[in-house]
Swiss-Prot record:
Gene Ontology biological process terms from the UniProt entry: translation
Described purpose of this protein according to its UniProt entry: This protein binds to 23S rRNA in the presence of protein L20.
Protein name: Large ribosomal subunit protein bL21
Keyword hit for Thylakoid: no
Stored HAMAP family: Ribosomal_bL21 (MF_01363)
Keywords: Ribonucleoprotein, Ribosomal protein, RNA-binding, rRNA-binding
Record-stated family: Belongs to the bacterial ribosomal protein bL21 family.
Sample GO molecular function, one term: rRNA binding
Organism whose genome encodes this protein: Myxococcus xanthus (strain DK1622)
Subunit structure: Part of the 50S ribosomal subunit. Contacts protein L20.
Pfam families associated with the record: Ribosomal_L21p
Length: 102
């Protein structure tokens, strides 16, 4: 069984046992997380498509890590000889999907 969830303004296709990196959400490592914004639930039978979400469906996962992505660097060089270097590390949450109900 698989589902398409929406979290952090993005959509993810997940199945039971998958480990996904999503935009940072609140929760300690080891905590259980429930996603209720389910756009599609599929499996052996015909898929259930929500308009906009599937009623009564939910995906439960376990938080594995709260971390940051690799640094993204931005360089800027002007004609006069000065440079500027900026960096950014986007925080994320790593979640293991434990169950899909729908």
């Amino acid at each position: 069984m698989y589902a398409v969830i929406r979290t952090g303004g993005k959509q993810y296709r997940v199945a039971e046992g998958d480990v996904v990196r999503i935009e940072k959400i609140a929760g300690d490592v080891g905590a259980e997380v429930t996603f209720t914004e389910i756009l599609l639930v599929g499996g052996s039978e015909s898929p259930k498509v929500g308009q906009p979400t599937v009623a009564g469906a939910k995906v439960v996962g376990k938080v594995l890590a709260q971390d940051k992505h690799r640094r993204v660097l931005h360089f800027r060089k002007e004609k006069e000889g000065w440079t500027r270097r900026r960096g950014h590390r986007q925080p994320y949450t790593e979640v293991k999907v434990t169950s899909i109900a729908g």
